[in-house]
Amino acid sequence: MNKMLIADVQSVADTRRIAIDKAGIRAIRHPVRIMDKAGVQHTVAVFNMYVNLAHHLKGVHMSRFVEMLNEHDSVISVETFEKLLISMVKKLEAESGDIEMRFPYFIGKTAPVSGIKSLMDYDVTFIGQTRNGESRFTLKVVVPVTSLCPCSKEVSDDGAHNQRSHISISIRANHFVWIEDLIRIAEDQASCELYGLLKRSDEKYVTEKAYGNPKFVEDAVRDIASVLDRDERIDAYTVEAENFESIHNHSAYALIECDKLKN
């Protein structure tokens, strides 16, 4: 019995002779194991995976991206992520590639007064690029914190407006940097950090701590930049702060970018 031949349309030549910078898949969820200071944690990541496509090719082999994820069963760290990136480019027979892996990352925290323990989640992204045989890795964390307005505190007889804020730190490093370390930098420079669970005594503590440590978004990004400037492991960084204003229907925002290798 003869088997029916199935046409491989994407492998035929393309006559338009226009190269594509990125082609691949987006928003595919996959379980992963991430190395952390306590060992390994299990989470679910959302992947974006792309490679370049030469001008004479009609399409990429989309199924190969999914095959790669299902074949990869190692604990993901900076080193294994780079190997995954290089392997993707080789498997897709491309010259350049990009992988973005975004996932919730959990850290156990202890309430400041009661000592009650809870988990706190953070948004973390691994970003890998390879071009002309050279790879670049970026680590990004988004840290929710509390911010309290210095102006509001100064002009008010009682209290000051405060709100939840997001501090984002993206780095390129020459040595290993723990995710927890970046998160700690952001929390230390905020008006106050957040906790998954607080009792009344803890609520009093965090309220008073924020009141004693007011900061604009400009203060937050400058203070964090000062810490990153002193860290010799970090070659480049981007720091962002966004306050979801409690007295306005808009956000306050600030950003600092620095490439130490160019300065």
Curated annotation (Swiss-Prot):
It is an enzyme of class 3 (hydrolase). It comes from the Bacteria. Pathway: Cofactor biosynthesis; 7,8-dihydroneopterin triphosphate biosynthesis; 7,8-dihydroneopterin triphosphate from GTP: step 1/1. Signal peptide: none annotated. Its EC number is 3.5.4.16. GO terms for molecular function: GTP cyclohydrolase I activity. The record marks C149 as: May be catalytically important. It catalyses: GTP + H2O = 7,8-dihydroneopterin 3'-triphosphate + formate + H(+). Keywords: Hydrolase. GO terms for biological process: tetrahydrofolate biosynthetic process. Belongs to the GTP cyclohydrolase IV family. Converts GTP to 7,8-dihydroneopterin triphosphate. NCBIfam families: PRK13674.1-1. This is GTP cyclohydrolase FolE2.
